[in-house]
């Protein structure tokens, strides 16, 4: 089996390569069909997915069985001021990959986000794959358009929405909190935005299960359990053994202090219903997955 990974140097792309090399992760061994898979890692310096012809030619040359698109413009605030760049990477890039995968009959696994949803409370019920997207930020809007292009142009597609992703690699909320906790006595974190922290180990494992599945469609794939960013930050400080005090603030208070920040959904908790009904939901509780992160973290920031 031949798997091509775009955005290979990001936190998810790196974790996918690690698991494919080790043939296992903390959750368990990889499926037999994935062992000895040929992995083609690629990043923007080798392939610009916003270039349609270059993308089609690259996919034709390598003939992958599966393409996992981890490439994205993920700076939520930055997307507001660099809308053209966000549109190219988050919408045009997936479109080009979908066109290319269709030409060689490859599966396309496209990674998306909880930010395609508006953040309405939904009666406190986590959003499953039937929920209607209505993004409130440029990031969410461009990611939703990318989803729509993938659905339209590649029949053998998986759209995997995740949330609050962190790992030992790259930049993420967990490592940011640790850095702040090491240099500050007190920080403030919003307490009225709720979602699902997701360890990249868990996400990568389930993406690889989908890579050998024929149950195409939209999937939610997040850590189990719901918390606020404030709750998450408190758990991080505890896990890192830091004494930094975390104080809660509202989104309105944060926005007043940071007027250039993008709107973010107040409620973006996802339910992994499709995962549970097909390949199985082995995503760990977010607190257990965070403890595992600290148990295996080498201290690098």
Model feature map: region roles:
Residues 263-301:
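C-terminal amphipathic/interface module of NAD(P)-dependent oxidoreductases
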Residues 49-89:
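NAD(P)H-binding glycine-rich loop region in Rossmannoid oxidoreductase-like domains
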Residues 206, 213-260, 294, 301:
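Mid/C-terminal beta-alpha module of Rossmann-like enzyme folds, strongest
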Residues 189-194, 219-226, 278:
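Glycine-rich Rossmann NAD(P)(H)-binding loop
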């Amino acid at each position: 089996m031949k798997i091509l990974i775009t955005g290979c140097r990001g936190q998810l792309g790196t974790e996918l390569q690690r698991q494919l090399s080790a043939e296992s992760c903390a959750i368990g061994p990889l499926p037999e069909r994935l062992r000895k898979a040929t992995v083609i890692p690629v990043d923007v310096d080798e392939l610009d997915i916003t270039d349609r012809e270059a993308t089609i030619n690259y996919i034709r040359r390598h003939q992958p069985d599966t393409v996992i698109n981890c490439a994205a413009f993920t700076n939520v605030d930055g997307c507001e001021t660099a809308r053209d760049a966000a549109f190219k990477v988050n919408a045009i890039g997936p479109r080009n990959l979908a066109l290319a995968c269709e030409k060689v009959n490859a599966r396309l696994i496209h990674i998306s986000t909880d930010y395609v949803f508006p953040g309405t409370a939904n009666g406190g019920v986590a959003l499953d794959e039937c929920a209607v997207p209505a993004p409130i930020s440029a990031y969410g809007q461009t990611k939703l358009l990318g989803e729509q292009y993938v659905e339209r142009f590649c029949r053998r597609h998986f759209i995997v929405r995740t949330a609050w992703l962190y790992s030992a690699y790259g930049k993420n909320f967990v490592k940011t909190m640790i850095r702040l906790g090491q240099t500050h006595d007190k920080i403030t974190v919003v307490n009225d935005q709720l979602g699902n922290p997701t360890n990249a180990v868990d996400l990568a494992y389930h993406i690889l299960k989908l890579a050998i599945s024929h149950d195409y469609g939209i999937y939610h794939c997040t850590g189990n359990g719901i918390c606020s960013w404030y709750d998450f930050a408190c758990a991080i400080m505890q896990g890192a053994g830091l004494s930094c005090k975390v104080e809660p603030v509202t989104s309105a208070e944060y926005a007043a202090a940071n007027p250039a920040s993008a709107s973010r959904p107040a409620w973006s908790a996802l339910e992994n219903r499709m995962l549970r009904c097909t390949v199985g939901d082995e995503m760990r509780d977010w607190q257990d997955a965070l403890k595992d992160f600290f148990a295996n973290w080498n201290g690098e920031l």
